Amino acid sequence: MRKLFTSESVTEGHPDKICDQISDAVLDAILDKDPNGRVACETAVTTGMVMVMGEISTKCYVDIPKLVRETIRGIGYDRAKYGFDCETCSVITSIDEQSVDIAMGVDEALESKKGEMDRLDAVGAGDQGMMFGFATNETKEYMPMPIEMAHKLSRRLSEVRKNGTLPYLRPDGKTQVTVEYENGKPVRIDAIVISTQHGPEVYLEQIEKDIKEHVIKVIVPSELLDENTKYFINPTGRFVVGGPQGDSGLTGRKIIVDTYGGYGRHGGGAFSGKDPTKVDRSAAYAARWVAKNLVAAGVADKLEIQLAYAIGVAKPVSISVDTFGTGKMTDEEIVSIVNKVFDLRPGAIIRDLDLRRPIYKQVAAYGHFGRTDIDVPWERLDKVEEIKKHI
């Protein structure tokens, strides 16, 4: 049976991604000085303006306007002709402390209040909710091919802009990849869509030629392309006005880009700007870690795990697994292995993945999962041998 599946990615200059990177830059700066700082930082951008808001409780000081300007400069919006300038944009901040009602549940979990705890029970989940983790062996990154390929194309767009290969490119851009599957395995790429912001001096014919030569051919293996592969490069014909001048941006608006490109389910919680006591982030990272190690251990070809939490309670209220018919054992047996090998209380996740560190801005663009260009703890295959002992 053949079917098509499509996923998209965006570059670091996309308005929503600018916001994610600013929020995580603030988080990293605080964790660097105060590893126990509590951060829920939201950012909005529009023409000529950045607003940073949220709830932050910390003993340290960080210069938020300076962080904002440095982040925007690093992305590439450093002159007015790009429609957004790190030096001249206004930066508005509105920061409160974390609610004492929320802090009360995170600081002392329900298990602690009832006297039925060990030390790791003392950290309660920062909110209720469910988080999903996913892995598949269809790529070496244990990621679905559509999102993995879309991320690589987006990253390459920024590379050729920054290294001067295509100097007329500007920071905003999007990619989209449609993969054809046969009996559950990727066999070819059916369509590639790339929209990239550019200077007014260049024509579409040049952009199409350059993107195919310096982006697509460099990233996509030739055996996945054929005479029927369709290419849509700047299909509107012109993309000069972009970034915050073209569209307003908000933190947390690219949650499918951040995860599995729609191939796996999503619990709805965004990542950027949240410290690791927020299970929206830490438990989603842990779920990816669990799923990837299970697939690498041969438990299934494709696996999704759901974790659910109650605010102020340390232990997950539920753990659920789906192997989509590819499991080498029952889903119930896999959940039993998860409970034996992994401790999924927030305090244990923070400890085992060493999450109270400034490691978040680097994943705020080009995906939080499947990253081989950086070392992030939730991508490590460090539980495979232990899992195999229980198979």
UniProtKB/Swiss-Prot annotation:
Gene3D superfamilies: 3.30.300.10
Binding, K(+): 42
InterPro entries: ADOMET_SYNTHASE_CS (IPR022631), S-AdoMet_synt_C (IPR022630), S-AdoMet_synt_central (IPR022629), S-AdoMet_synt_N (IPR022628), S-AdoMet_synthetase (IPR002133), S-AdoMet_synthetase_sfam (IPR022636)
Residue numbers binding ATP: 14, 172-174, 238-239, 247, 253-254, 270, 274
Entry EC number(s): 2.5.1.6
UniProt binding sites for Mg(2+): 16
Gene Ontology annotations of biological process type: one-carbon metabolic process; S-adenosylmethionine biosynthetic process
GO MF annotations in UniProt: ATP binding; magnesium ion binding; methionine adenosyltransferase activity
Cofactor: Mg(2+); K(+)
Reaction(s) the record says it catalyses: L-methionine + ATP + H2O = S-adenosyl-L-methionine + phosphate + diphosphate
Keywords for the protein's UniProt record, in alphabetical order: ATP-binding, Cytoplasm, Magnesium, Metal-binding, Nucleotide-binding, One-carbon metabolism, Potassium, Transferase
Chain spans, region Flexible loop: 98-108
Taxonomy, superkingdom: Bacteria
Cofactor binding description: Binds 2 divalent ions per subunit. Binds 1 potassium ion per subunit.
Subcellular localization(s) per the UniProt record: Cytoplasm
Pathway membership: Amino-acid biosynthesis; S-adenosyl-L-methionine biosynthesis; S-adenosyl-L-methionine from L-methionine: step 1/1
UniProt similarity note: Belongs to the AdoMet synthase family.
Function, as annotated: Catalyzes the formation of S-adenosylmethionine (AdoMet) from methionine and ATP. The overall synthetic reaction is composed of two sequential steps, AdoMet formation and the subsequent tripolyphosphate hydrolysis which occurs prior to release of AdoMet from the enzyme.
The protein's assembly and partners: Homotetramer; dimer of dimers.
Designated name of the protein: S-adenosylmethionine synthase
Gene name, Swiss-Prot/TrEMBL: metK
